[in-house]
Amino acid sequence: DHASMNNDLFQQARSAYVSKDYETALAQFTNCLQDTSAALAPGELGMLYHQIGNCLVKLHDPNEAIHAYSQAKIDTSYDAQGSVNYNLGMVYASQHDYDDAVTYFQMAIDDPKYQTPHKAYMGLGNSLLKIGKSAEAGAAFRSAALDETNPDPTKALLNLGVCFMALDRPMDAIASYESALQFDMAPAIRNKMFANMGQAYVAAGKMNKAVRAFESALADKTY
């Protein structure tokens, strides 16, 4: 009499998922869910629905994915609710439903157990930008950049600069870009950063600096 789900089946499903065989993974996770010989322990229902949702996202079935993630949220013993909320935010954003996306990204951020808030802050900022809330988006990108779990703050700082430009604050945009330049980044991103910086200097009426920034953007830094 098992006190939890069929672990062999679960491991098979996980390895199918890792091998990008999402159809098989979906079928096997669903089997774990429907296996009556094993009563699910607290948290396992949420974990299975979370994995099923991930499979459905990979299989480009957003509506069913939303349904699965919503089922996962019902299992309050499941620890990774922050991740489920983040995934819901991503699915809603992919469907251009930015208001719902904002709600779920915020829920992920508010969850103290959620380990990677910078990801939810990035999702939140991008969704807020889409609905024209540049100031709130900027605050979200700033939080993403400052999150010490963020391995690469450059994208957040680049987006923060974009928000400042939308708010007609070019000098603040320049400060964001300059703080980003201390980090390693791909040449294409670095060139974009210099081009954005050039535009910000133009907006601030500093033409000499604008020219220098544009020259840096055009000079191939790949050696």
Regions found by a protein language model. Give the residues of each.
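Canonical tetratricopeptide repeat
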Residues: 44-47, 51, 87, 123, ...
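N-terminal leader/linker segments that initiate helical-solenoid repeat arrays
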Residues: 1-47
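TPR/TPR-like (Sel1-like) alpha-helical repeat modules
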Residues: 178-182, 195, 199-223
